[in-house]
Amino acid sequence: MTATRLLLPARALQQPEWASLDELKDVLLSLEAKPPLVDATACADLTAELGRAARGEAFVLQAGECAERFADANPETVLAKADQLHRLADEFTDTSGLPTVRMGRIAGQYAKPRSNPTETLSDGTVLPVYRGDAVNAPEPTLAARTALPSRLLLAYRNAGNTLSTLLERDLGLAGRTAPQRTYAGHEALLLEYEQALVRPDADGGRYGSSGHFLWIGDRTRQPDHQHVQFAASVSNPVGVKIGPRASAEEVGTLVRMLGDRRRPGRLSLIVRMGRENIVPHLTSVLRALGDEAAGVAWICDPMHGNTRTNGAGQKSRAVDDVMAEIEGFVSALRAHGLRPAGLMLETAHRPVTECVDTAAELASPTPLPHYESACDPRLSPRQARQVVARTAALL
């Protein structure tokens, strides 16, 4: 390994400008020597469960933070998040009759792609944007916003602590209830971190040991770029976010690069098009894919395409927009003889007020009072239950 960047910036978008490449080299060497965070068998088990969801025999519920904070990697907070996920999944199963695959946006969701590389404060100061705790800190100072490679080691440690807590929870409940595994997924954004944690699997291949399920974001899904090539190189189940700008040709290329008909749960397409775009754009993609559409798991992300700015200048989302996208997603798939495989939500385990119930409420100039997110707005526990219950009723 050299002190130069491992990846060409033009081929790997949304990568930090690290403060020291020499320190980055040392950090990556340290990560390469560490044990895997998850084992390959669990990743293979998740692939099989996603395959069942793709066939309509189960449903994936993925919920959790937009951007995890290191400070939340303590047993009390992790258990609260896991309990919320499992309650939502139980409610979904009770209503729909479908088994639920339970996956958190957890134990690795420490990095976020951003629309702009900088942020201008009210006094005119220009700072690097907050990119997640694995890169920098949200406090509005230059020191906090500096991208420090040492934070990758903190990401590994906090992810490990979180996964240990989840495993202890699952094992502790196994003797008292039907065992329900908590899988962990995150966006595989920081490619040097992800690559440093690639390990051999039992079949002679390689898997990303940073999490059970890894997805590529809508901003980094270019088929000829490094994020997609990384996803193609590992045996984990992987997802790709598909937004309204994704052409049918691009989606087809991604399916052929990342899909595997021998393993139907290998590829999930996570659709995030917004309530206005979901039916026409998804219909266009499905028509172009034809029979290939049946070889992937179709998951709805009804959050990211419906982010707005409210009258107080805060980013927010409306539950009625979220539900409209879910309804359009389900109807478009059914029109093509396909089954919805899952739902990805950004949720808080505390009673925050970051999303509103109706779009009309977004016009209010009064700031939402309990706004705690480090990045995007999350559903409160009440709102999450409402969305899950209404989705279950659709199915």
Describe each model-derived feature in a short phrase:
Residues 1-57:
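N-terminal basic/disordered segments at the start of proteins
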Residues 251-254, 266-298, 304-353:
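Non-transmembrane, aqueous-exposed alpha-helical and coiled segments at domain scale
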